[in-house]
Amino acid sequence: MGSRCAKLNTGQSPGHSPGHSTGHGRGHESSMKKLMACVSQDNFSLSSAGEEEEEEEEEGEEEEKEELPVQGKLLLLEPERQEEGHKDNAEAQQSPEPKRTPS
């Protein structure tokens, strides 16, 4: 899913060059909006997939709900790492979180 997002941005680069002199502001806004939409879609797609996968592996609905927002932040910060080690990141984060709660 991240690949599709990257392709969208790549395809915009060549189209942005000729439109640069026509209307920079307009082109920039479009890029931003498309980028945001792309990130949002990516976020939802990965989150949904993560929910299903984690549900099968670990039976903890409460933990999953707490983890969802964390996954969203990770996606924006390091989308590549999320794709490669999606499950690893999720499990690694669940370990320290429960320990912090009693503290």
UniProtKB/Swiss-Prot annotation:
- Please provide the record's keywords in A-Z order: Chromosome, Developmental protein, Differentiation, DNA condensation, DNA-binding, Nucleosome core, Nucleus, Phosphoprotein, Spermatogenesis
**GO BP term, example:** spermatogenesis
Per the record, the major location class is nucleus
Q: Where does this protein have compositionally biased stretches of type Basic and acidic residues?
A: 78-90
UniProt lists compositionally biased (Acidic residues) regions at: 50-66
**Gene Ontology terms for molecular function:** DNA binding
**Residue numbers of Phosphoserine PTMs:** 95
* Region annotation Disordered: where it falls in the sequence: 1-103
According to its UniProt record, where is this protein located?
Nucleus; Chromosome
Superkingdom field: Eukaryota
Please provide, in alphabetical order, the Gene Ontology terms of the cellular component aspect for this entry.
cytoplasm; nucleosome; nucleus
Q: Coiled coil where?
A: none
Record's compositionally biased regions (Low complexity): 10-21
Query: Which family does the UniProt entry place this protein in?
Result: Belongs to the protamine P3 family.
The function of this protein is:
Protamines substitute for histones in the chromatin of sperm during the haploid phase of spermatogenesis. They compact sperm DNA into a highly condensed, stable and inactive complex.
Q: What name does UniProt use for this protein? A: Protamine-3
